[in-house]
C-alpha cells in the first residue's frame, strides 16, 4: 500500500506520517525533512534556502524525483511532502492535512524553536508563497487544488493519535475493498 500525506507547514504531516509508519511498519520518506536538512547543510534558514531553490529548480526537482522514484518502487510506504499527492500518482490513499494559520504557527514556533510567532509567520508565509510559485512554474501544480486527495482532514482539534485512528479506519477499509488507485 502506498500512502501520501501532504499539507502546509505545521499542519502535522510529518507527525501523522511517523505515526502511520510505526503503526503499520511502513517505510517513511519525508520531503520536508530532506529540505530542512539541505537548508541546514547550506547554513541557511528555510525561507533563504527556499529562495535559492526558487532560482535553481534542481533542488526541488532532485527531492521530488527521488521521492517519486522510491515510492513507485516500494510497497508499504508513507510518502510525506507538499507535492507527494501529486507526484505519487499510483498511491492507494492520498491525504491532505490542514489547520488554521494560528495553529500551524504555534506548532512551527515549537518545532523550529523560533523566537516568536511574528517571526514564524513572516518565515512561513514567505516559504508558502515561494513554494506555490515554484510548484506552478515547475509542474503546473496549484497547491490549493486538493482534487487529487482522497481524505482531507483538519488537524487543529485532534492530536496525532486521533488523526491516526481516522486514517487507520480509511486504510482498514481500503484493505477490505481493494481498488485501482486513482
From Swiss-Prot:
SUPFAM superfamilies, sorted: P-loop containing nucleoside triphosphate hydrolases (SSF52540)
InterPro entries membership: Cyt_kin_arch, Cytidylate_kinase_dom, P-loop_NTPase
Gene3D superfamilies, A to Z: P-loop containing nucleotide triphosphate hydrolases
Keywords assigned: ATP-binding, Cytoplasm, Kinase, Nucleotide-binding, Transferase
Gene Ontology, cellular component aspect: cytoplasm
Binding annotation for ATP: 7-15
One Pfam family hit: Cytidylate_kin2
Subcellular location, record wording: Cytoplasm
TM ranges: none
Origin superkingdom: Archaea
Enzyme Commission number, as recorded: 2.7.4.25
Primary localization class, coarse: cytoplasm
Catalysed reactions listed for this entry: CMP + ATP = CDP + ADP; dCMP + ATP = dCDP + ADP
NCBIfam families (alphabetical): cyt_kin_arch
Protein name (database record): Cytidylate kinase
Highest classification ranks of the organism: Archaea, Methanobacteriati, Methanobacteriota, Stenosarchaea group, Methanomicrobia
